[in-house]
Amino acid sequence: MKLCHFEAGLDQPLFLISGPCVIESEQLAMDTAGQLKEMCAGLGIPFIYKSSFDKANRSSTKSFRGLGLEEGLRILADVKAKIGVPVLTDVHEDTPLDEVAAVVDVLQTPAFLCRQTNFIQNVARAGRPVNIKKGQFLAPWDMQNVVDKAREVGNDQIMVCERGVSFGYNTLVSDMRGLAIMRGTGCPVVFDATHSVQQPGGQGATSGGQREFVPVLARAAVASGVAGVFAETHPDPACALSDGPNAWPLGMMRELLETLKEIDALVKQRGFIEHKLMKA
């Protein structure tokens, strides 16, 4: 699949979607985008910058949601123009999709909204590639129905993203079989390595997380076979205004990417023998 300036798929090198969870300031956006671009260029990893103008699903109304649509889009447009990278942001049911699609390169749908038919189809109609996050409550094979809804309105530039499965209260687990199953949709599969270690609502009014396990799950996912990795990052996760406990430190990102790139090259060179046994 053609995605921004590169090809994305199981037969293509790993790509990265990364950035702070939420747009905190223009300076932070520019700094992180610039550093990530430099890292990825040095490693030969295609890169899409991600950050949100509004986090509508925060645990509490007291939590920071973002800078809002107008200011957020202005900053994303500046990142795109001045840093020279494609940008992705998430949208919601009340988002003016045409306005957002005029600025960003990729639209992302939140996991909680993956079953909302009208929403998925409206986003797909906006004319941009879409990264559809699988709900924490959804079986991997049920993503075929979600993809079909998006394709029905004429959008073939669809990615599916695994971000963990609810496992009791305040806990997520990652079933790597789901990555192989979702390949059956014919869409590039992305693994969200940072939200997969989130502990939703685990700190009462905020979510917790176990960022120390980000590389563990990222290595496992890339070894299983994915088109891309999604990993939110922050120069100082302890001070991040959203999802800090599961954000990967920016200063440690290059080391992680080096490992993932090596694993990706090996498994894609060898191929995926499981396809001989899985139903088409």
From Swiss-Prot:
Pfam families, A to Z: DAHP_synth_1
InterPro entries (alphabetical): Aldolase_TIM, DAHP1/KDSA, KDO8P_synthase
Pathway linked to the protein: Carbohydrate biosynthesis; 3-deoxy-D-manno-octulosonate biosynthesis; 3-deoxy-D-manno-octulosonate from D-ribulose 5-phosphate: step 2/3; Bacterial outer membrane biogenesis; lipopolysaccharide biosynthesis
Keywords of the record: Cytoplasm, Lipopolysaccharide biosynthesis, Transferase
Key word Cell membrane present: no
SUPFAM superfamilies: Aldolase
Top-rank lineage group of the source organism: Bacteria
Reaction(s) catalysed by this chain's protein: D-arabinose 5-phosphate + phosphoenolpyruvate + H2O = 3-deoxy-alpha-D-manno-2-octulosonate-8-phosphate + phosphate
Cellular component aspect of the GO annotation: cytoplasm
Cellular localization per UniProt: Cytoplasm
Enzyme class, spelled out: transferase
Any Gene Ontology biological process: keto-3-deoxy-D-manno-octulosonic acid biosynthetic process
Family stated for the protein in its record: Belongs to the KdsA family.
Protein name per its UniProtKB record: 2-dehydro-3-deoxyphosphooctonate aldolase
Organism: Thiobacillus denitrificans (strain ATCC 25259 / T1)
